[in-house]
Amino acid sequence: MASEASDVRLPPGGPVVLPLVGIGTDIHAFEDGRELWCAGLKWEGEGPGLAGHSDADVVAHAACNALFSAAGLGDLGQHFGTGRPEWSGASGVTLLTEAARIVRAAGFTIGNVAVQVVGPRPKIGKRRDEAQKILSDAVGAPVSVSGATTDGLGFPGRDEGLMAVATALVVRAG
């Protein structure tokens, strides 16, 4: 019995170019004395910032991880880890811009990125359009941002930190 895959017919002129999908996550604990950066934006009056080697922007970092995952290019730590002092204190937008450059240099076109930040604050909806513009400009492709809470469960529910989960779609160029 033939498998369904063997019944697939390729269009004349060559193979179908399939998109590649990656997933990325990032988690940081809150730390007093730091500014809160999330989704490329500084959130004044939203409490302590996030601990990290860079600005600890979980949304930008998860987006980087998703792009690297989709392209098979490792992860955030490989490219911008704590062993790389030149990235110390870097903004998430700077890292995301560089991640997109690396992915394109490896021969990929970026389709889009979607990111969800998980935690009770900041309230992403208040500045969603602003965040999406900044992140889309950094990637050079559409980036959507959403927020979710955990109904008091886990470390985000206890207001100990933030988590973000992202997906990215890329296609091999040419």
From Swiss-Prot:
Annotated positions binding 4-CDP-2-C-methyl-D-erythritol 2-phosphate: D26, I27, H28, H53, S54, D75, L76, G77, F155, R158
Stretches that traverse the bilayer: none
Enzyme Commission code(s) on record: 4.6.1.12
Site label Transition state stabilizer, positions: H53, T149
Binding positions for a divalent metal cation per the UniProt entry: D26, H28, H61
Annotated disulfide bonds: none
Catalytic activity: 4-CDP-2-C-methyl-D-erythritol 2-phosphate = 2-C-methyl-D-erythritol 2,4-cyclic diphosphate + CMP
Pathway assignment: Isoprenoid biosynthesis; isopentenyl diphosphate biosynthesis via DXP pathway; isopentenyl diphosphate from 1-deoxy-D-xylulose 5-phosphate: step 4/6
EC class: lyase
Record's function text: Involved in the biosynthesis of isopentenyl diphosphate (IPP) and dimethylallyl diphosphate (DMAPP), two major building blocks of isoprenoid compounds. Catalyzes the conversion of 4-diphosphocytidyl-2-C-methyl-D-erythritol 2-phosphate (CDP-ME2P) to 2-C-methyl-D-erythritol 2,4-cyclodiphosphate (ME-CPP) with a corresponding release of cytidine 5-monophosphate (CMP).
Subunit structure: Homotrimer.
NCBIfam families xrefs: ispF
Protein name as catalogued: 2-C-methyl-D-erythritol 2,4-cyclodiphosphate synthase
